[in-house]
């Protein structure tokens, strides 16, 4: 019995391996056939693609070889080259223009620097000799009048300013109150220091002329009313008779100049409906530059023709200033075209304001013995 079962298993095993080998050979043959077919198809596809690419290239090349196409391509290349050339030329032109503009700016800056240097050197030469013979700002009023050799004991600069205002500026709003242009007034100061007989250019704003007049009075070493008579004149402000007697103690130059200035202010106040400056408003603006104590001089005016000091100065520093002090540097501090401060409300001397208002309102009654001011 066992031998019969073993023989059956051997036969089945041999049959199984025999059939498996047959199936494997068949599968291998099938796979080989499939791979061969795939390779054949791939070969055909590659050849087909290559043929199509070659055909397309030949077609494009044939088109490019046609005269019309070749001409169009040439035109396109020429246009591209022309456009590129235009951009290059434009870039070169713009560069040249920028260089030219830069050169002009450099030349302008050099001219301004040279002119400023010339002005500084001129002032240095003048101040090396002490006070220049032509200076009017910062110089005692008696010396100025003596130099001008005029029969009229009034500084010419005041006469020219007043004449200009009478002719063109009485109706200007806020006259003697509105701020002036620093740069312009510095130019006028320089012009009058070099030529006291210079005329005010046409077209100058009356406000700037009024500021120039106001500044000249502030630049005087002593006020028109003098330090010695300050208290006496102040105490006389309530009496025309006492005021007249006190003013007669002034020197001839101070007396006539004070009469001249207050006569001008009277004319301005008569146009107050137009210029908004009545006698009180004018007195508020002009008192600080006409009448001040030794310890209360109008410092705000010093700041625009000399650099402000960082430390307190003695009262006589104004007369001994150097040209470096008198010439402000445009590159420092406020812009040169900024306005000039024309008052210091924190230090207003209301007694002096009342004196000047009295001199304006009662001018003709107080200055009875003065030569009548005649405007041209």
Swiss-Prot record:
Top-level taxonomic group: Eukaryota
Limits of the Rho-GAP domain: 139-367
Gene Ontology MF annotations: GTPase activator activity
Keywords of the record: GTPase activation, Phosphoprotein
InterPro entries linked: Rho_GTPase_activation_prot (IPR008936), RhoGAP_dom (IPR000198)
Site entry (Arginine finger), positions: 177
GO BP field: signal transduction
Residue numbers carrying Phosphoserine: 59
Record protein name field: Uncharacterized Rho GTPase-activating protein At5g61530
Organism name: Arabidopsis thaliana (Mouse-ear cress)
UniProt lineage: Eukaryota, Viridiplantae, Streptophyta, Embryophyta, Tracheophyta
